[in-house]
Swiss-Prot record:
Allosterically activated by GTP. Catalyzes the conversion of uracil and 5-phospho-alpha-D-ribose 1-diphosphate (PRPP) to UMP and diphosphate. It is an enzyme of class 2 (transferase). Its cofactor is Mg(2+). Binds 1 Mg(2+) ion per subunit. The magnesium is bound as Mg-PRPP. Keywords: Allosteric enzyme, Glycosyltransferase, GTP-binding, Magnesium, Nucleotide-binding, Transferase. CDD domains: PRTases_typeI. GO terms for biological process: UMP salvage; uracil salvage. This is Uracil phosphoribosyltransferase. Pfam families: UPRTase (PF14681). One of its GO terms (molecular function) is uracil phosphoribosyltransferase activity.
Length: 209
């Protein structure tokens, strides 16, 4: 489990609890997700490489350290993953953005791809995949397999909630992918939804049923 990080910062846990409440409006849910994604981005980007840069302060010249956001790609698993993007782009505005569309077959719970669009040169970039939920793990596994065809430099997966079976599925299929989550919930129900969970993240973000 060395590639699994649970982000336990008090602000993360506070905002996640507010999001879980069934009476949270779509507006509140979106706002909280944006705030949470910024907080989680701090931990997820902790090991990003720095490059020396010469700058002028008001008093003298110095050498500072900067990250190269242009070497980073954020990949949203549609549609709920889009809720993560604004917050993360606030932290790393130079990042490129890709999208993969996957839907879950209600009969088999397997992921079916319907859209895939990535920036050029992904083989020279580190990649962060965002999706609020790691449930069965099927969508995450399918996404990683598709991304690896483009040979990105590295892949991280970021979610709000995960369950043990989803974590195990992703780790077994892609042990090189680092997983970041705000919480590990108890289990999946018979329909593949996380318990206690927070409901359908996409519906709650966009106010749909």
């Amino acid at each position: 489990m060395s590639n699994l990080t649970v982000i336990t910062h008090p602000l993360v846990q506070h905002k996640l609890t507010l999001m879980r409440r069934k009476d949270a409006s779509s507006n509140s849910f979106r706002r909280l997700l944006g705030e949470l994604s910024q907080l989680m981005a701090y931990e997820v980007t902790r090991d990003m490489p720095l490059s020396p840069v010469q700058i002028e302060t008001p008093l003298e010249t110095m050498t500072g350290q900067m990250i190269d956001g242009k070497k980073l790609v954020l990949v949203s698993i549609l549609r709920a993953g889009n809720g993560f993007l604004d917050g993360m782009l606030n932290v790393v505005p130079g990042a490129r953005v890709g999208h993969i569309g996957l839907y879950r077959d209600p009969a088999t719970l397997q992921a079916v791809e319907y859209y895939f669009k990535m920036p050029a040169g992904i083989d020279e970039r580190d990649t962060i995949v965002v999706d609020p939920m790691l449930a069965t793990g099927n969508s995450a596994v399918a996404c990683m397999a598709r991304l690896k065809q483009l040979k990105p430099r590295s892949i991280k997966f970021v979610c709000l909630l995960a369950v043990p079976e989803g974590i195990a599925r992703l780790q077994q299929a892609h042990p090189d992918v680092s997983i970041f989550t705000a919480a590990i919930d108890r289990e999946l129900n018979e329909h593949g939804y996380i318990l206690p969970g927070l409901g359908d993240a996409g519906d709650r973000i966009f106010g749909t049923k």
